[in-house]
């Protein structure tokens, strides 16, 4: 009987306060997070930024209990999915591969090989494809496969995106309906979808499908909610978690909250549309930062739809995805990791100088300039960063 390995890919997160610095270092060491024209500066800059941001990030994690629950929740999702698949007669074992913290992708691959798995289904826990999330994880897995002859022997099927999965849409709709029903004026409550943002250049210059998939997903969810409740709620779609000086997808969530308050919205339901697990961006950014902004701008009832986590209907939807992947047309790892031809991401040593910032998260030229300035400030022990208290 075929032994199927289901590889769940996610971002990862620091589980303890002392893990925050190393986690940030891993994150910013990824050349797809910070784009630099010279690879030699990647790790020094990652060290500098992670050192600079560590204190603020530690405070954020302290506010949610001292660490990210992402690993614990993802492992719970893996166990529930494994059980659901075995109940369908599929001999499956689930594995977790985090991009920037434990358990890393390398560890999951070693476990898969040790368990004598015959076929692997790769399922990113990002419903919407982006070259910086699912794409980065697919390419990391491909990199590991290229240097591992034993891993190359395994059949690998990939699920690239699943924003329109029936179980996912239905789960989101049910959770939204629960919050609407708890409002004093259900049909007057405003729904604010908030998705993790990406740089505008990813979409407009690099052809990233992320924005289109997010928009289509929101429409599917709203349609499901309207059919269930029998009335329509007004809604907006916004983007959060912007990092760095580059323009990201708009509108930004914090600005939308201010505008909604100014327009007289009193009951607000915030829906984290691109997150399937509770983590720092739901528990701290939305529940603390955004809630404060909303209340300060006249919104009285601020409600946040909980993340899907192990919601049974959602887990069943994931099982549907895996079953369909095993029986349907195969999408190889190479196909899943493939980028639009105009995107320059790999290999890093081929990046060129210039002023076109296609597919950049941070503009490499600006980052290089800032790095040089910061380096000299560290050497001389004086400057603007010392003046404002960052150094």
Curated annotation (Swiss-Prot):
EC number of this enzyme: 4.98.1.1
Chief location bin: cytoplasm
Domain of life: Bacteria
Reactions catalysed, as given in the entry: heme b + 2 H(+) = protoporphyrin IX + Fe(2+)
Pfam families assigned to the protein according to its UniProt record, in alphabetical order: Ferrochelatase
PROSITE patterns: FERROCHELATASE (PS00534)
Pathway: Porphyrin-containing compound metabolism; protoheme biosynthesis; protoheme from protoporphyrin-IX: step 1/1
Iron among keywords: yes
Amino-acid positions noted as binding Fe cation in the UniProt annotation, renumbered to this chain: 196, 281
Protein keywords: Cytoplasm, Heme biosynthesis, Iron, Lyase, Metal-binding, Porphyrin biosynthesis
Molecular functions (GO terms): ferrochelatase activity; metal ion binding
SUPFAM superfamilies, per database record: Chelatase, Chlorophyll a-b binding protein
Subcellular location, record wording: Cytoplasm
Gene Ontology terms: cellular component: cytoplasm
GO biological process: heme biosynthetic process
Protein family: Belongs to the ferrochelatase family.
Protein role: Catalyzes the ferrous insertion into protoporphyrin IX.
PANTHER family: FERROCHELATASE, FERROCHELATASE, MITOCHONDRIAL
NCBIfam families (alphabetical): hemH
Protein name as annotated: Ferrochelatase
Source organism (scientific name): Prochlorococcus marinus (strain SARG / CCMP1375 / SS120)
Organism classification: Bacteria, Bacillati, Cyanobacteriota, Cyanophyceae, Synechococcales
């Amino acid at each position: 009987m075929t032994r199927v390995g289901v590889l769940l890919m996610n971002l990862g997160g620091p589980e303890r306060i002392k893990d925050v610095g190393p986690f940030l270092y891993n994150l910013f060491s990824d050349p797809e997070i910070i784009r630099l024209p010279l690879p030699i500066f990647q790790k020094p800059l990652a060290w500098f930024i992670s050192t600079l941001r560590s204190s603020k990030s530690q405070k954020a994690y302290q506010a949610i209990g001292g660490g990210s629950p992402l690993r614990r929740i993802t492992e719970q999702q893996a166990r529930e999915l494994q059980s659901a698949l075995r109940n369908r007669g599929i001999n499956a074992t689930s594995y977790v591969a985090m991009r920037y913290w434990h358990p890393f992708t390398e560890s999951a691959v070693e476990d898969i090989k040790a368990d004598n798995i015959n076929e692997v289904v790769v399922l990113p826990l990002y419903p919407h494809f982006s070259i910086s999330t699912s794409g980065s994880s697919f390419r990391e897995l491909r990199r590991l496969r290229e240097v591992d002859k034993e891993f190359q022997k395994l059949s690998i099927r990939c699920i690239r995106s699943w924003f329109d999965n029936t179980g996912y849409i239905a789960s989101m709709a049910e959770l939204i309906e629960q919050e609407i029903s708890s409002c004093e004026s259900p049909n007057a409550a405003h729904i604010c979808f908030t998705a993790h943002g990406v740089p505008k250049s990813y979409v407009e210059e690099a052809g990233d499908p992320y924005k289109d998939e997010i928009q289509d997903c929101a429409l599917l969810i709203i349609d499901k909610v309207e059919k269930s409740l029998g009335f329509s709620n007004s809604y907006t779609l916004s983007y959060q978690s912007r990092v760095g000086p580059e323009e990201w997808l708009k509108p930004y969530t914090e600005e939308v909250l201010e505008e909604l308050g100014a327009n007289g919205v009193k009951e607000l339901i915030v829906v984290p549309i691109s997150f399937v697990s509770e983590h720092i961006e739901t528990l701290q950014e939305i529940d603390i930062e955004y809630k404060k902004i909303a209340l300060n701008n006249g919104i009285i009832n601020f409600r946040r739809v909980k993340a899907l986590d192990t919601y049974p209907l959602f887990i069943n939807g994931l099982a549907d995805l895996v079953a369909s992947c095993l029986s349907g047309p195969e999408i190889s790892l190479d196909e899943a990791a493939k980028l639009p031809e105009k995107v320059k991401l790999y290999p890093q040593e081929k990046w060129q100088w210039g002023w076109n910032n296609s597919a950049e998260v941070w503009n490499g030229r600006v980052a290089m300039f800032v790095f040089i300035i910061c380096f000299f400030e560290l050497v001389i022990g004086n400057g603007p960063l010392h003046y404002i208290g960052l150094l």
